[in-house]
Amino acid sequence: MKTAYLLAAFAPLVGAVLAGFFGRRIGRAGAHTVTILGVGVSLVASLITFADVMAGNTFNGTLYAWSVIGDIRLEIGFLVDTLTATMMCVVTFVSLMVHVYTIGYMEDDDGYQRFFSYISLFTFSMMMLVMSNNFLQLFFGWEAVGLVSYLLIGFWYTRPTAIFANMKAFLVNRVGDFGFALGIGLVLAHFGTMDYAKAFEVAPTLAERTIQIIPGTDWSLMTVTCICLFIGAMGKSAQFPLHVWLPDSMEGPTPISALIHAATMVTAGIFMVARMSPLFEMSDTALGFVITIGAITALFMGFLGIIQNDIKRVVAYSTLSQLGYMTVALGASAYSVAIFHLMTHAFFKALLFLAAGSVIIGMHHDQDIRNMGGLRKYMPITWITSLIGSLALIGTPFFSGFYSKESIIEAVKYAQVPGAGFAYFAVMAGVFVTAFYSFRMYFLVFHGKERWMQAGHGHDAHAGHDDHDTHDDGHHHGLGPNDRPHESRLVI
């Protein structure tokens, strides 16, 4: 099975290198062929791994030792269990769909090969993060995901808004990563190892240990370590108050919005807390902190979604709210439920983002939902996909979101940690808020009067915001007086 693990992790990297360094030589078709092939191989290897794990086999081993410093070993290794196998399948499947979608979405872009190289590199970084068996490799995967997201958010680097957005994402995540690095430093200093298994084995003996952050005051080592690690998750998974970078990340092309928000960067923090669950279970204070932050994010980001008029920003704030739900589940010690919602959310949120991209193309790059209406008649396939995604998002019975959200609400109801009462109120209220902003967007876009006839122009259609998911090259944005919305190409 080691071959399958290596293929799953490194096949996207091979595609990224070929498309990045030899993109001009192999051309557009060559670039998307090698990257899609790489991610496809990774998906097949991930499915084989998942089947093997379901058969009861797990793996925890070292591939390569970088260095040995005293008793501390710095290694590259894989830990493959149920959590890892699930994340591998989610990441590779959504990434493959985004790669295929990109063929149509970016067909006229000058940076076509560069974009395919970036999204494959993004997939590789996330695979190394989820498959790691030690804190050092986790940190490198963590930072690699952040670096590539910086490159992707600022993909159209000639636009000042894109440069501002990627710098904002980079700097806000540095705040979270500082806490994350402190947490790893505490693990190294007090646990004496970077290996997950050894750290979890030592943890019970350190449950009562205290440290002095401020002279004369004792703080629980486990609480401080867990909160520092969670601050890292607050940055990556865009939890309040470190959520501010994520709406601006809409400056990147729509395919990467789907990849960042559905399967990769923003789920890294949720995955990390679930992986560190043996440590978090030793501190009720840390769990109370997690559940409170998650509850605030779940409710108030939903409120912000109600007042957005940019179609991608509505879906972005929806992502923030749903990440809050996952964090609440983590705080309630329902780790499997959090990962379940992560998995279902990855699929329906990617669907919603890709449908939003289809709407943007059909509307000639107008993103303001106030200028839409009645698109169901012109974009029937996009309409039905948006409806399916919206029904799953609000938790309609028999759709995937219903089962995962229901599980979260039930877990919070019986949680005993501090802040559980507020969290229960927040997730219950959030159900109604989610339904409101989801169907506000759905009805404004696909039903009602055809308002683009009233707009009758391109640039003014963007009044009130400057989120244009297209190049800053001066071509026509929005529908002209003689234009009509149209369905996207089949590949999209």
Residue ranges and their predicted role:
Residues 1-492:
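...captures the hydrophobic TM-helix bundle architecture rather than a specific catalytic motif
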